């Protein structure tokens, strides 16, 4: 069910183009949480706090994109298996990361999404 005045084919194309963006943002949120949980070292506190802000933003943005997909009459697909199936992003290392490593990794991921 669509809530748009766009022609159906146009709405479908726009929704299809938004789907990968939504998955990227969900993945950024999850990767950010992994970094948040594993950051250590001298700059732990400021990095940990900055990650909270970024993670919240990525989650809200993914929600906004998903809602736009719905408005266009499509079903958003944002399950973990959808992220895996689409091959979104590189895996974050499962390791303790110092602040610079965590932020560098996330900066690279953000750049790949942008």
Indicate where each model-derived feature is located.
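Short, exposed beta-strand "edge-strand" segments with a Pro/Gly-rich flavor and a Y/T-containing core
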Residues: 1-6, 70-78, 90-97
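Disorder-to-helix initiation segments
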Residues: 1-21, 99
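Glycine-rich, flexible loop/turn motifs
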Residues: 2, 35, 40, 79-80, ...
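Helix-loop segments that flank and shape redox-cofactor active sites
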Residues: 5-13, 28-53, 75
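Amphipathic alpha-helix face/heptad-repeat signature
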Residues: 14-28, 54, 102, 106-113
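Structural signal for well-ordered, non-membrane alpha-helices
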Residues: 26-33, 59, 63-66, 111-114
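Acidic/histidine-rich alpha-helical segments that form the ligand environment
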Residues: 35, 67, 84-114
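Conserved alpha-helical segments that form or flank metal/cofactor-binding pockets of metalloenzymes
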Residues: 40-82
């Amino acid at each position: 069910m669509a809530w748009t005045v766009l022609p159906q084919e146009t709405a479908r194309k726009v929704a299809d183009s938004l789907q990968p963006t939504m998955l990227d943002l969900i993945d950024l949120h999850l990767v950010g949480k992994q970094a948040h949980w594993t950051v250590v070292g001298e700059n732990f506190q400021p990095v940990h706090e900055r990650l909270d802000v970024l993670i919240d933003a990525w989650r809200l943005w993914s929600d906004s994109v998903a809602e736009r997909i719905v408005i266009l009459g499509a079903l958003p697909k944002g399950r973990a298996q959808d992220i895996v199936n689409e091959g979104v992003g590189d895996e974050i290392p499962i390791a303790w990361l110092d602040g610079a490593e965590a932020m560098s990794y996330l900066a690279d991921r953000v750049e790949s999404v942008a």
